[in-house]
């Protein structure tokens, strides 16, 4: 031993503790770490009756490298290695002893100690302050109890723990008391065992020790790297094991236990990477089966604080995908009814399409309309799988509110199909919805104009008004038509600026359908629009539009029935006269017609039958 300090510690703690047991036994075990060398000492001491000098003892010390402590699954198995000197041959005591795990002498018999007292001693062992307990047990029971309890201490904690199974008074070295000592003499600091139930975590150890159940100690050793040197983590770990093994009488208790397990894990291992392996083991599907089923587990983990967990530890997304459609929908229904979804639950609700298809929820349209609408409203992907032509008018109307969400409207890809179905089924279309449809898919403009130009159409004035925002799309549609009806003409006249670049650049010919559909019964506004429109070009069609519009406008001027706001629209496109003639609106209009015909290279003969009225034609000829 290279350290004189450690040699002195071994020598000091090998001295007789003056222990005399309940049956006058005088053998006991001591275990403690060395301070400078990497060894943990487990020693057994016998009183040397054969010595003439009082107080002599034999102490057999086993030096176990601290890195090898994890290899010892049961410290009671060390007892068979200790050998009381019965001869004068002491060479065996300086020779390493082979440790054979299965070679222990007998099973421990600790039932006489009782589960409660074993649990209380365990709590004292883990205490941060030294504990002195009045010994009530035989020497053998004391040794087996303390060595058995060492099996339930993670190695990193054990490296700083020391015990003595028998001493007359508390023992210390270098001013430091051993962690746990069973003492035979009463004193102010000596603790009496109460035999009352301890905390659940300690009680679990007490039951395991007394009944020779090594499973819990095996678990502690398996996860000892995650427990480290933290007594708090060990306590939380054991509490989780207690909860997992609790027998629940009903679903309410199962739910409570599940919440306690999750909360205990969070408190014990608050960081995501703390206890990572243990968390994954706890969250295995077997836990869910025992505590309310997989859907209930996934619902619970979607509503609690999950800042201490990762989805990988829970296998969250994999387990969602492994649910049957019925199971997932049941879970989803629960998620929709709670207000305390965490980020996992919110993501699940927002990404429903990853777990079910539209075909799998289509039947809900008949069986649970509200639930169906809720699913669709939370999933753009499923919304995009809808065949809108299958929807009734009422179903469409109840779905439209979801488009008030800008993100949902942006993600929707089938505006034209929806818009067409709404038109065909005569679903009222608000201007806001029309604006969204036109802005997200310009082909909806074409769809609306096609519908409006059909025989069985029903005008939607709010929709028509929105078309003024899309003159290019309207003009493009018109360029592909040979004829239009009155309602389309109304849209053109009231929505399209006749002098916009899109109108001018597409040429005059595309406006012939508007010219052709006008009759004497049509509003004068249509003719004024056509009149103004003709000023965009100097070609044949422009003169045709001019001629068509001139006569109805002129007739109203002759009768002084053209309202001023309408005259205001055409006056800039009439001839400017001398101030003493400028009051004559009819003359101003006729002069402009004549001027345009002259500019186009037409002869005076073009005015002979320019209008159906002979008098008007004569006036025109005079203006030439």
Label each region the model flagged.
Residues 1-102, 120, 141, 157-163, ...:
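Extended, helix-rich scaffolding/adaptor regions
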Residues 1-12, 58-67, 72-194, 199-246, ...:
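Soluble, amphipathic alpha-helical scaffold/repeat regions
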Residues 207-624:
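Alpha-helical structural signal with a strong bias for long, charge-/Ser/Thr/Gly-rich
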